[in-house]
A protein has these predicted regions:
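RNase H-like nuclease fold core
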Residues: 1-61, 65, 69, 158, ...
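A short hydrophobic/aromatic micro-motif that marks alpha-helical segments and, especially, helix-coil
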Residues: 17, 32, 93, 194-196
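Glycine-rich loops and low-complexity Gly/Arg-rich segments
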Residues: 23-27, 37-42, 49-52, 79-82, ...
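Acidic/histidine-rich catalytic cores and adjacent linkers
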Residues: 50-61, 67, 100-215
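Conserved beta-strand -> loop -> alpha-helix junction used to position metal-binding or nucleic-acid-contacting
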Residues: 54-100
Length: 215
């Protein structure tokens, strides 16, 4: 499940059956999605007797914890993307470059190898991450390498949910939301042709798109 947006004030939240590639539930959004929006969709599935084997989601703060009763997989693609946003495409430090290489292996390796590489990286750079710089104007200290810290601790914080698919091999849980990403990309491409469409007609277009393609 994931949300996609057109600007800040219009989006749609989707829940898709990853293996049947079937749209199960959707909700139009007029603002940033909340945990309550996702829980509304989960409750709808429960009310309609769907068996929830697992849930793949992105990094909305607190969402994995709110879904603790289920097997939750944090989308590995979103995690790599988040690290890239912190480090940029061209990290300026050796630590950042090494961490970027490790992050890019996330979707292509196993749990033990990845966690081992990340632990070795921290053993090498952990003290470096603690460096602080004094701001002479304010007299306050801040972390010198904040972006690299944020990238590392983002992976560390989500580690519990990055390998659910691996920890439960008998449960068919994808490791990414790539199916939803493909749907969102296709939908946005088609809507781009009709740029300038009002919100009302955009909703009608999206409803018809899903009716025809994912009925």
């Amino acid at each position: 499940m994931d949300a996609t947006y057109w600007g800040r004030n219009f989006g749609v939240l989707l829940i898709v059956d990853a293996y049947r590639k079937r749209l199960l539930w959707r909700k139009f959004l007029d603002k940033k999605e909340t945990i309550a929006d996702y829980l509304e969709g989960i409750e709808w599935l429960r009310e309609h007797k769907f068996k929830i084997l697992g849930i793949v989601c992105d990094g909305l703060w607190g969402l994995p914890q709110a879904l603790a009763q289920y097997k939750v997989q944090y989308c590995q693609f979103h995690q790599v993307k988040a690290v890239g946003e912190y480090l940029t495409k061209n990290p300026q430090t050796d630590a950042g470059k090494e961490l970027q290489r490790i992050a890019h292996l996330l979707c292509h390796t196993d749990k033990e190898s990845f966690t081992g590489m990340l632990e070795m990286w921290y053993e090498k750079w952990g003290e470096w991450l603690k460096h602080r710089t004094l701001d002479r104007k304010t007299g306050k200290k801040s972390y010198t390498h904040q972006r690299v810290r944020s990238a590392y601790f983002s992976m560390k914080r989500h580690m519990k949910w990055l390998w659910t698919w691996y920890d439960y091999p008998d449960t068919p849980i994808p490791n990414t939301n790539n199916i939803l990403e493909a749907i969102n990309t296709d939908l946005k491409t088609k809507l781009r042709i009709h740029n300038g469409m009002s919100k009302r007609y955009r909703k009608l277009f999206i409803d018809e798109y899903f009716r025809l393609k994912y009925k």
